[in-house]
Each structure stands twice: as structure tokens, then as C-alpha cells.
Amino acid sequence: FGAQNVIPETIDGPEGEQVNVTAIYPQDRSRRIEVTFASEEERTVLTSVTIRGEVSAWTGPGGLNLGDGIETVERLNGKPFTMSGFGWDYGGYVTDWQGGKLNQIAPGCRTTVRFNIPPDVHSEDAVLGEAPHSSTEPAMRKASAYVEEIQISWMQEHEY
């Protein structure tokens, strides 16, 4: 990648948390990848790879892309899924793939997806907050949610 394209960074996480990542292609929004390691200083034992934003040159598991809508993700998963409501630090995350294709793409490997809603779309109170929602709920579909983050993570030995 070249030294100028692999930079340690600290990014904002949920609830005011600061997260150490290694950014690959940090200045190129279409190719940027954020990688975490068990030891960020030594960059050993890969724990996650994340793409986020509106567009990316990278494609996630099963053909998953940033910008995909709920219906597309259901098709890729092979079934509906459960996600959290919007408007809070953990809002829009898929919380249960319901045993679909994106549930576990390889032993010990998880796919995490976060949806967002466009700023110009008025979201109903029904899709806000911490409560779980089915991807099939009419209010979720009406919100025009799109994938804004895809993360692939690997469980560590102590998590098995």
C-alpha cells in the first residue's frame, strides 16, 4: 500500500469512545479501509476491517455494498433480519441476521452492517430508539435506510 497510505488514527466511536485504527488509503474516501488489531501498536492479530461512508471501491460479503437498501440486504442475506432503531449511538445496526447467509461468512467471522437514513427523509418515531425492528416493517422501509458501514470481524480465541 505504501507507507503514506497506511496511517494509525484515532476515530470517534459510540458513547464518546475513542478507537485506534489503522487507516489504509486514509485520504481516498472510495478506497479507505479501517483496520483494527488485537495489538494496534504492533499491528498483529487482525480483529476487524471496516468500510464506511456513501461509496466504496470495496465490496463486502455476498456482494454487499455501501448504499444498499434494506431490500437488497435482505436478498443478499436470503431472509429478513433484525436491526436497531435509529437516532442513538448504536442506531441502525443489524442485531440478528436470523440465520441468513450473512450470519457467519466463515467460522469465527462476523458481518456487521449499519444502516442510516437520509437527512432529508422525515423518520417516523416508530423507527427511532433502541428497540429492535424487523427489516420487513413498513416504517423501516419507508425510512429509505441505506448501508453506511460494513465491518468484518474475527472472534479471538477467548470469544469462542
Task: For the regions a language model picked out, list residue spans one by one.
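A glycine-rich, hydrophobic loop/mini-helix early in the fold
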Residues: 11-53
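Non-cytosolic coordination micro-motifs
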Residues: 1-15, 48, 53-160
